[in-house]
């Protein structure tokens, strides 16, 4: 169905004026519903005071289901749909039925809006298909219909809800709620847990069950949604809140003051977001190149079309009709403040007309009085501002620095300027300065407001004088960047370069580093005034950041340098300006398209070059070097003239070979080839490429390639120059295979080279039929889905017939078999490939070696999967003997599988392997970087991890969500919250971003376990739920930890999470029981409840519903030990044996701590040594640390040192070893008195009598 503006407003009218709305004479000539409702106040009150049965009034005086327009005799209202800011009279002289037809949704004249424009997208986006017209007619034809929408699903709710949540909540049975109260209680638990997205999903599920949705239920849903930033982050999401409100009206539930305040609060917050976003986008479009501005413009226009405050003001004013509502001072403060800051003048006037200034207590909230003064000043009502100041007897801000007092005077200062009384503002400031001489302080916010507004009027010199006086007389005052930028901007707008230069020198350029638009105007002023020396000094440090935030190309700056004969300065600045390392390293740069910006900068630079400079060889070489430094081939507009001019110098040999490096010449060949491919072989592009190939073939210029596949691909366009291509092909291929290119497109590159290097398709020994079948099996499914038995059956036929597969199939076959752990089959394929190698070598040894290099590369991969590291090294050595090295992906697998038994520092191993790839000039891939980053992150070597991540981006590789997940995890491991948040935001803004649950879980776990911040944990949880991926079981466990381990502990919310999982059919696993046991036993010390939960988990296992793991037993043991019930803790160990669950290091850690607590060190040592037994998981560094602490607790330094020696033999990283050994060194340095281990027996008194000791011993035995 379609939700029109008229439909929305008339739903509100129905609630504010009643179902049947009387229309009285004289006729109201109003063009929109908002004003009509406002002016109906008196008439409606009259109708209510003179109560009369509806039937006794003339039927035409009521708006019923069929009367959507307003009429009186020959004058009809509501035919047109003007904006709310305009007043248009409906055209007279039309018959009534004509206007009714116009309101029919099937009519082409059907009005789409009397609703505020902020909701126009809601009206348009909720249209169903044409097939839904019948439903539409039954509901939308009459906005005042007594029928509800309970039987119709809403496409808005269906499309705006993430699929994962929709599918999970679809499993909830409405019959599970026995009453509305039970539903409301569950809703309250979700809301109190701030699970706003789940609250909305639950609402969507029950919206067809009006018996469950009461006013209280609606308010709970609205309050939960309006406090969540997710629902305010976009126009689509804010519409969900409005939609819930409209559903309530359709259900004939009258909103109360809580309802109105909640929805209006949400609209005010949305208005602030829209305002800030518009400001940001405007700065990036006003100075941008048209091609970039065109990309940003649609988003900007969409935001500008939103008017959330129009809706907020309308809802507030209409709510006053026939509603005895008393709004809170906080509500007035927020609404008035929002409209005065972000609203239009007409919105502010409409609001102030309805605000009961005489009755509300402005001192009821600290923000209300300042908001009122600011609003009245903007409304040009300065006398009212003075009246408020007198009424509440505000003190001088130099003596009373309370927040309300200072902000009120700041509002008065704004009011002076809003009403064109800046002279009076200056007089007021003078009075403040006279009092400042008496050691009183002028609040900085008032000073900044005065200076900023004065500068914006154009009185920048006077503002600067006031600023100097403030700095001189007030020692604590420091001008804000916005104040400084306002003064500088005004000077630039007035073209006063002398003042601007002096002002920047006085306050330093660094003070303006974040004022990008002002810096842009300043640099432009320097360029126009010809101050090129100062321009060079000031442009160099800021040009990159200013461009990133404004999308400005600075062609005027380059033009100024060129016109003043400083072309070298311009070229150096250009190189820095588009340096990919600078742009990629600036993660906060908001440029929507950095590539488009770089192209615009380059094209703008070429345009300001004179015709002579466009042919200058040094300029051309500098430009080529700059282009070569970019990540990809820049598709600039001057590619052809650049290549044509520089090729002319090369062909005529006017360019000495020593002036052009092999890499620059190689780039010229690649760039020319790229141009041929891009233009699909135009005549000019092919001429340039052939000329460069001739220069390469005669040996005059040496070349070094990075993207040789582009050159090889361009050969298909040079069929008329086959002899030239043949003469250079072998040299280029030889250059290509050195380094064995292996980036993301490596497989395609290798295919290109294979076609050039050896065309083996016509080998007679290849069985084409089996080769085709095997190739199809290998490529049509993932390796895990390939039927290995059938695959190897086909391969067996080749052995029987002495036939072979195509050489390129063998590496893929080995890879698939390896991933399926069929290493015996891999060995047979390897032996078979040796026979093919011998056959190929009879024709071409070079081609045979290349084939064997591919096979050996695959065998290295296979050996790494099998963890046969000696074999991997052997195969690698054989490759090197042939002149080849493994691919990047092969090295990545070596790193991933590099952990040998007993090796506890695999990060160093990973770095050594990675350094080997660099030594051999292997082109790294994303997969390779991910492998190294993962190892470094787990080893907490974050500095190296971050450095490698930056190196990866600088090399032009685009990080994936896996990459970001790794570096985010590394940042979390060292507790760097700002870095983790920065990386997370960067990950979500990546163009190739594919959401994965792991990074979200990492951030949630980090906020819960490291930062102890429940609010942020819930923020990331809701962000996860807003994607199209489902939360994992671990996510729910972390959510339980957020409520159950962080203060204030909320066990009710923990239960709500479990109830949510149960109602949505999410399996409750052993980890969830373990988390709940920990919360009950360790956090709230309710050991009985924890034990009950533990027994319930065992019963669930016995019933076959869950699978037990060590975490469950660990939580119960820790719970018992925390409550001094070590005996029962030992009994849990017996339960583990009964359920075939092995001890692990973490359970033993708990037992060691428990026994240490009661002085039973020998028992602790028993379990410590038990981990070395066969079938146990082994010790962790924390296990050694706990045992060391146990011995030190009884002053047995010698035994503690023995444990440290054991640790050293395990080859753990040195920092880990040093940290634990320092415990012993510190203890030995103190030389404490030694206690006998026998004291442990005396400590048993804390456990009870001798029978307790017997219980422990028997449990252990």
From Swiss-Prot:
Q: Which residues form a coiled coil?
A: none
Stretches for region Disordered: 1225-1261
GO annotation, biological process: mitochondrial gene expression; regulation of translation; translation
Write down the InterPro entries for this protein, in alphabetical order. Pentatricopeptide_rpt, TPR-like_helical_dom_sf
Annotated PPR repeats reside at 365-404, 405-442, 443-479, 480-514, 550-584, 806-849, 852-886, 887-924, 925-959, 960-995, 996-1031, 1032-1068, 1109-1143, 1144-1179, 1180-1214
Give the molecular function GO annotations. mRNA binding
Which segments show compositional bias classed as Polar residues? 1237-1261
Record localization: Mitochondrion
Q: Which UniProt keywords apply?
A: Mitochondrion, Protein biosynthesis, Repeat, Repressor, Transit peptide, Translation regulation
CC per GO annotation:
cytoplasm; mitochondrial matrix; mitochondrion
- Gene null: resulting phenotype: Seems to stimulate mitochondrial biogenesis and especially mitochondrial protein synthesis.
**PANTHER family reported for this sequence:** OS02G0304800 PROTEIN, RESPIRATORY COMPLEX I CHAPERONE (CIA84), PUTATIVE (AFU_ORTHOLOGUE AFUA_2G06020)-RELATED
What is known about what this protein does? Answer: Mitochondrial RNA-binding protein that acts as a general negative regulator of mitochondrial translation.
Supply the NCBIfam families for this chain. Answer: PPR
**Listed name of the protein:** Pentatricopeptide repeat-containing protein 5, mitochondrial
